């Protein structure tokens, strides 16, 4: 894969994507061939997977495969899997013990490599795998270092650890701790075939009334000379982490994306005239010390997915107001905007719109009216699988009924593979069998990650039928939805792992 010169490509992409956000009411629910459709799979507290601690290897694998089947049926094209929820790991690691959410005992080997297994199964289905890290959090419900596994890095470096509320965290302001966190992420990037590194909204912890995060001593040691106040120093600590992670990822594998899903409000307009027209009680900039604007403007992330977990028209923080505000934040920037959707609130919240079956549909419809919103991330799979107010059905039969490719990121790579050869289309009792052969140059460079198969009936416009992961230089695809009485033209393209598509090879049935 060819990787472009960063500065030149970022400038060109800015020209391409620097368009005004417009509404297109008559295309309200139109599905695009390009849209991220991702879902979070949380491991912390066994929210999504594994469903409980101590399952056998066979049970864990069966559960994950079943979840992927559910994801496919809903028309998704990416999963965001939490692989480091509490300074631990779902893979053998030099930077954290085995997670207790696997076996019930922190540090206990589960008997296989869950991350390798998950990536393999995910890619079989041609879904993206976003590896989800929580950088600072060490515990969920205690502050006793002695309860951690004996080999836990936090026990070896207690000076890196801060207790706040009833939890332990790595100090964001200690350079050695920051380097350690980054190396832990680098370990995964280098050793596993992930598509993206993902972080959520947990940076400095959400504030607790009457309690100050205990980092005054660290500020005196590391920050006082450069920063006149502790808040600016805290923001710089997070900014440095974000930049360092991105630089480390790109040095190892330039095609691996880096994205963050922050809290839904940067600042209120009352705090900053360029902030959103909201009255949120929590703000990224002021409370979590997460300056999302800085990351976007510095090009330190490839995507941002604000968690806009409120209804359209909600007084304190309206979904529609924030979706538009975030669209303006990424305008003219080589950063994709996805929206974090609150599936967990459907029919489960005090705010009346969440009891309306159409609220979630309206939110996704609104996203599609905003040109710079490139898709959605849903929290979480467990909630979607409950099918509240029929949302799972709505996704599979309506909103996501047609497949979609993940949007390209031309600032990372904009060179498409050579087109494959659709050598034959054979009709049989099971449907139409397509025989696909990759272009010889793609075989040498391993450019092709998957094939996109399109179909046109008669003189109608072609539509995306499916995608298929490349497994061999020659492989087949069965269209079992074909009507034997109709004539079709099939088009096949090769796509690389950043979703750049080749020209199409085509054949028509007799």
Curated annotation (Swiss-Prot):
EC number(s) from the headed UniProt entry: 3.2.1.-
Reported phenotype of the disruption mutant: Cells lacking this gene show up-regulated sigma X activity.
Position of the signal peptide: 1-30
GO molecular function, one term: hydrolase activity, acting on glycosyl bonds
Gene symbol of the encoding locus: yngK
Organism: Bacillus subtilis (strain 168)
Short name of one Pfam family: GHL10
Family: Belongs to the glycosyl hydrolase-like 10 (GHL10) family.
Cystine residue pairs: none
Entries under SUPFAM superfamilies matching the protein: (Trans)glycosidases
Protein name: Glycosyl hydrolase YngK
Enzyme category, top tier: hydrolase
Keyword annotations of the record: Glycosidase, Hydrolase, Signal
